[in-house]
Swiss-Prot record:
Species for this entry: Sinorhizobium fredii (strain NBRC 101917 / NGR234)
Source taxon at top rank: Bacteria
Keywords for the protein's UniProt record, in alphabetical order: DNA-binding, DNA-directed RNA polymerase, Nucleotidyltransferase, Sigma factor, Transcription, Transcription regulation, Transferase
Family membership: Belongs to the sigma-54 factor family.
Name the record gives this protein: RNA polymerase sigma-54 factor
Record-level GO BP terms: DNA-templated transcription initiation
Biological role stated in the UniProt entry: Sigma factors are initiation factors that promote the attachment of RNA polymerase to specific initiation sites and are then released. This sigma factor is responsible for the expression of the nitrogen fixation genes (nif operon), glnA and dctA for dicarboxylate transport. The open complex (sigma-54 and core RNA polymerase) serves as the receptor for receipt of the melting signal from the remotely bound activator proteins NifA, NtrC, or DctD for the expression of the regulated proteins.
PROSITE patterns: SIGMA54_1 (PS00717), SIGMA54_2 (PS00718), SIGMA54_3 (PS50044)
GO terms assigned for molecular function: DNA binding; DNA-binding transcription activator activity; nucleotidyltransferase activity; sigma factor activity
Motif (RPON box): 487-495
Stretches assigned to coiled coil: none
Keyword DNA-binding: yes
DNA-binding region listed in the record: 396-415
């Protein structure tokens, strides 16, 4: 059979991932910090994009009325009210709109540079969050105390360097000391070998050891230790309490971790009363002496969504404007440049591309904001009992339930809830916190969330006494009487995940603590 070439026409549909669609997906899963960095890069590349400050956007805190163009959803019942006005659009007429006819350009879905989109009054919870120490979102400088900043706490390295100047006179010793200080971690532990340090500095191992012994007497006590046992031993030595029994105790911390008090009494050569006193003294020591110093600036978590009570008893879900980057398209500049550029020129093509990219970016940002609000509103509606009564009433929830309710794909819900935070009357939570697996009911009732069951287990164990320590089987019986159908191995798995020891270890520890409290 002869082979021949032919040309055929065929119509078909296929899904194509365009660069714009990929950008929208990436924007959806970005945190507000990543989004701010991305927009800063776009503003730098696109001459038609500009940042809009809070003052220009009309975000004054003294506005008495709620603006109807703000994104707000009411999640308290079946009715949900969301204003579908474009978040990145203006509601009033501007000179740019009059220019659109002249230039044959579409200026929809972009900010007008001479109008100010309004926002809803900041809810009480957002105001409380802003008043917290270290909270971000304010650029006006109010509440900033220069004296407090200048008199800030010293770092661990600065504290140790000051002591080196008084402890060592020889330049060689100071060089060794400064090198060892640079090898400390944030907890104050030394991660350097004596021989390696000596070879690197061209000093003898004896000199490095001598300097290290002096450094181990610095404040805070316990610094420059290489192990936890050495850290505790240094602190006990400075307190003049490192006797042979205590030295044996800190050398066998693994037995203490296993609550093997019988072996500890035998190794230390003490009776039960002496061991209890030694354990009480060990508890007063600091296992991480360096963590009490400032290491870096702690950034406050800025919530993406804020929830507050509605007057009708429901919940108002609002986007946090401090987490929304505000950008506008300078179409007046676009019109001015277009007048002076030739048609079909490279400049005109570049400007048209910039305008197209700017329009797409503003639409993507608007869609991102609305998607976050829609997902958060559905989560609040599903977890209404949690907001009212607490974690014991947290419902089991998964991505599919939320996706089906808002007519979106599960992957979209997953991207929205990734690294996004919501401020509620119960505190600040990651959106992922509300998604927990389901645990069946013992009486064919409503299922229970795994997080609420873990909370019950933690509460029961925290309230037990030394004479009534609950075993895993006891916890299973209590939960089944409360309507939770759970297996003993599941209780053990949850307990271990929360770093709670077994009932035998808890009983030993509680009895030892009870006896120590009597002294």
């Amino acid at each position: 059979m002869a082979l021949s070439a032919s040309l055929h026409l065929r119509q078909s549909q296929s899904l194509v991932m365009t660069p714009q669609l990929m950008q929208s997906i990436q924007l959806l899963q970005m945190t507000h910090l990543e989004l701010g960095q991305f927009i800063a890069q776009e503003v730098e590349k696109n001459p038609l994009l500009e940042f809009q400050s809070a003052d220009e956007a009309g975000f004054g805190s003294d506005r008495p009325e709620r603006d109807e163009t703000g994104l707000t959803a009411e999640a308290g019942g079946a009715e949900e009210s969301v204003d579908h006005g474009d978040l990145y659009d203006s509601a009033t007429t501007s000179p740019g709109e009059r220019l659109s006819t002249e230039l044959d350009a579409d200026f929809a879905n972009v900010f007008q540079d001479d109008t100010a989109p309004q926002r809803a009054d900041a809810p009480e919870l957002l105001g409380q969050w802003k008043s917290m120490p270290g909270a971000g979102g304010s650029n006006d400088g109010e509440g900033y105390d220069l004296d407090d900043f200048v008199a800030g706490r010293k770092t661990l390295r600065e504290t140790l360097i000051e002591q080196v100047a008084f402890a060592f006179a020889a330049p060689a010793d100071r060089l060794i000391a400064q090198h060892l200080i640079d090898q400390l971690d944030e907890a104050g532990y030394l991660h350097a070998e004596i021989a390696e340090t000596a070879a690197r500095l061209g000093a003898s191992a004896a000199d490095v050891t001598r300097v290290l012994l002096v450094l181990q007497q610095f404040d805070p006590p316990g610094v420059f230790a290489r192990t936890l046992s050495e850290c505790l031993a240094i602190q006990l030595r400075l307190r003049n309490r490192l006797d042979p029994a205590m030295e044996a105790l800190v050398a066998n911390l693994e037995l203490l971790a296993r609550r093997d008090f019988a072996s500890l009494k035998k190794i230390c050569g003490v009776d039960e009363e002496d061991l209890i006193e030694m354990l009480a003294e060990i508890r007063k020591l600091d296992p991480k002496p360096g963590t009490s110093f400032e290491t870096s600036v702690t950034e406050a978590i800025i919530p993406d969504v804020v929830v507050r009570s509605a007057p009708d008893g429901g919940w108002l879900v609002e986007l946090n404007p401090d987490a929304l980057p505000r950008v506008l398209v300078n179409h007046d500049y676009f019109a001015e440049i277009s007048r002076h550029s030739q048609k079909n020129s490279a400049e005109q093509a570049f400007l048209s591309e910039c305008m197209q990219n700017a329009n797409w970016l503003t639409r993507s940002l608007d869609q991102r904001a609305r998607t976050i609000l829609k997902v958060a509103s559905e989560i609040v509606r599903q977890q209404d009992a949690f907001l009212v009564h607490g974690v014991d009433h947290l419902r089991p929830l998964n991505l599919r339930i939320v996706a089906d309710a808002i007519k979106m794909h599960e992957s979209t819900v997953s991207r929205v809830t990734s690294n996004k935070y919501i401020l509620t009357p119960r505190g600040l939570f990651e959106l992922k916190y509300f998604f927990t697996v389901s645990i069946g009911s013992a009486e064919n009732g409503d299922a229970h969330s795994a997080e609420s069951v873990r909370h019950r287990i933690r509460t029961m164990i925290s309230q037990e006494s030394a004479d009534a320590v609950l075993s895993d089987d006891d916890i299973v019986d209590i939960l089944k009487r409360a309507g939770v159908d759970i297996a003993r191995r599941t209780v053990a798995k949850y307990r271990e995940a929360m770093n709670i020891p077994s009932s035998v270890q808890r009983r030993r520890e509680k009895r030892a603590l009870a006896k120590a409290a009597g002294f």
